[in-house]
Amino acid sequence: MIIDEILARKIFDSRGNPTIEVEVYTDDGNYGVAAAPAGASTGSYEAVAIPVDDAIAKLESEVIDQLIGEYAADQEEIDRLLHEIDGTDNFSNIGGNLSVALSMATAKAAAASFKMPLYRYLGGAFPTMPYPLGNVLGGGAHAKGATDIQEFLVTPIGAPNIDQAVYANTLVHKRVKKLLTEAGIICHKGDEGGWAPQIKDSKAFEIVSKAVDEVSGELGFEIRFGLDVAATELWDGNNYVYKDTKRTTEQQIDYIAGLIDEYNLYYVEDALQENDYEGFARLTEMVGDRCLICGDDLFVTNVSRIEKGIENLSGNAILIKPNQIGTVTDTYNAIRLGRQYGYSTVMSHRSGETTDNTIAHLAVAFGCELIKTGVVGGERIAKLNELIRIGEEIGNDRMTESPL
C-alpha cells in the first residue's frame, strides 16, 4: 500500500468558507478522502491554517514528491515527514489545514487497503461508543448579540445505546425551541446549529435546564447539562467582560463554581482564559469531583501544553481537535498523555465543518468518553450518523463508562 497519488481541491464548509479536501491513493487501488474544518473561536496556540489556494500550492510544490512512495500504513512516519517538510512548530508553512486533511486521508487510505473501518484500523478490537455532547443554545463567537456564554450543551450519559443518545440530544434541541417560542422569543441558529436567541444568560439557563429535565423524564434516563464558556473571548487582559458586568479572575471562578452547583453541570469547557493554568487548577480543586473541567484553548491538543496542565493540576478533561495540532499521530499522543494522568478526553468538531466524518472514527478508535459534534445540521449529523453505523458493527449498547 504505497502512496502513488495525492490530489487536493477547494471545497466549502458549513459557513460557506473555503477549505481544503485531500485524496490519497495507494498502489493497490485504494484511497482515502478527508477535509479540514475551521474554528470561529480559536486558541492562540493552534496549528495555523493558511489560505486554501496557498495550501494546495504548497502541497504541489513541497509535499507531494516527499510522500509519493511512502508506506501509507506507517502513520507516524507520514506525520513525521509532514512536520519535517513544514519546518515550523505550528504548521505555519504548509498549513495545519493541509496537514490534518492529508494525515487523515492517509489513515483512511491505509484502512481501506486493510479492508477495515478506520476506527478498527486505528483502535483495535474492543472499541466503545462515546456519549454525544451537543450544542442546543448559544452565542459568543458563534452568534453575535446572543448569550455571552458561547455554548449551552447537553449529553445523555444515561442513554443505553448510541441511537438513543443521539435521539435524546435532538429532542432537547427541539424542546429548547418549543420553550423559546412559547416565551415569545425569536429563534435563530448559530454556527453549530444551536439556537441563538437574543436573551440573557440567566434566561438561557432557565430554558435549557427545563428542556433537559423534561426530556430526561420522558425518556427515562439521565441527560446532563454543560457549557462552553469560551472565556478567552470574554477576557480583556484584566477582567471577563459580560454584557452587564465585569468579573475578575476570582469572581469568574466563583461564578462558574456557583453555576456548576446550581444547575448540576456535568461539563464546563474553557471556564477561564487560555493561559490561566492556576485558575483552572483552583476551579478543578473546588468542583472537579463532580464536573468535567475541560480545556480547549488551554490545551489546544498540544502535548507540551497538556504537560503544563498536568504539572499544575489544571482541569480534568481535554478537548481534542485534530486540526488544532495538525496530524493523526499528534492527536493520538495528546489523548494518550491525558489518559495516563487521569484526564477524560472529548473529541470535537469545529464551528466551520464539512460532511467529513473522520472524527467519529477517531473518537471510537482512541477511546474518548465524549464526542462534541453538534446536534443538527448536515455537517453535524454526518458524524452522528456515522457513530450509529459504527454502533451497528460493534454493538450500539457498548457505551463508554461515564467519567463521573
From Swiss-Prot:
EC number: 4.2.1.11
Annotated localization: Cytoplasm; Secreted; Cell surface
Cofactor binding summary note: Binds a second Mg(2+) ion via substrate during catalysis.
Catalytic residues (positions): 192 (proton donor), 321 (proton acceptor)
Reactions the enzyme catalyzes: (2R)-2-phosphoglycerate = phosphoenolpyruvate + H2O
One protein family per Pfam: Enolase_N
Cited SUPFAM superfamilies: Enolase C-terminal domain-like, Enolase N-terminal domain-like
GO biological process, any: glycolytic process
GO molecular function, one term: magnesium ion binding
Domain of life: Archaea
Residue sites binding (2R)-2-phosphoglycerate per the record: 150, 321, 350-351, 372
Cofactor dependence: Mg(2+)
Pathway: Carbohydrate degradation; glycolysis; pyruvate from D-glyceraldehyde 3-phosphate: step 4/5
Gene3D superfamilies cross-referenced by the UniProt entry: Enolase-like C-terminal domain, Enolase-like, N-terminal domain
UniProt binding sites for Mg(2+): 228, 269, 296
Keyword tags: Cytoplasm, Glycolysis, Lyase, Magnesium, Metal-binding, Secreted
Function: Catalyzes the reversible conversion of 2-phosphoglycerate (2-PG) into phosphoenolpyruvate (PEP). It is essential for the degradation of carbohydrates via glycolysis.
Family membership: Belongs to the enolase family.
The protein's name in its UniProt record: Enolase
Taxonomic lineage: Archaea, Methanobacteriati, Methanobacteriota, Stenosarchaea group, Methanomicrobia
